[in-house]
């Protein structure tokens, strides 16, 4: 809530942006590029950024939004679902996207929220929600 002015309440509208930045270990680069490009149909491109040692991968999703992946040896890395922020993808057919992920060898994650969760290499979890 923003400061009040002249006795009236003033509110600031805040929204979550459509860009996400995560970290991964360098040995995951190829797996992650494959995961997004082949499995999810959202090719990743390498992008150089001043001050960052290795090129990042930037994924542009067809329905909007971007995911940038910065590579560092200090990134968390696990074969189990990471207990951190889980990211949401939206699709017309969440079940079909999950099936494609599973057929590509990605790991399904069970959670009572709904049935469409999977883990990418390194432990980051995504949920797939319907677009409507």
Regions from the language model: what does each represent?
Residues 18, 107, 124:
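Short acidic/polar active-site loop segments enriched in Thr and Asp
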Residues 42-81, 125-131:
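Conserved short beta-strand elements that form part of the metal-binding/catalytic scaffold
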Residues 17-27, 57-61, 75-102, 114-121:
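Vicinal oxygen chelate
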Residues 1-34, 39, 45, 84-87:
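N-terminal beta-strand motif that seeds the catalytic metal site of vicinal oxygen chelate
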Residues 40-49, 103-111:
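Short secondary-structure junctions
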Residues 12-14, 36, 50-51, 61-63, ...:
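A generic structural signal for short, solvent-exposed coil/turn residues
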């Amino acid at each position: 809530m923003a400061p009040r002015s002249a006795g009236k309440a003033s509110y600031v509208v805040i929204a979550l942006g459509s860009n996400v930045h995560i970290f991964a270990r360098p040995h995951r680069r190829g797996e992650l590029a494959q995961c997004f490009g082949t499995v999810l149909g959202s090719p990743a491109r390498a992008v150089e950024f001043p001050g960052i040692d290795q090129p990042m991968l930037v994924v542009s999703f067809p329905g909007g939004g971007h995911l940038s992946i910065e590579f560092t040896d200090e990134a968390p890395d696990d074969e189990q679902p990471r207990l951190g922020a889980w990211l949401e993808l939206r699709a017309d057919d969440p079940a079909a996207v999950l099936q494609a992920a599973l057929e590509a060898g990605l790991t399904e994650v069970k959670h009572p929220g709904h049935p469409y969760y999977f883990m990418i290499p390194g432990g980051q979890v995504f949920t797939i929600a319907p677009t409507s």
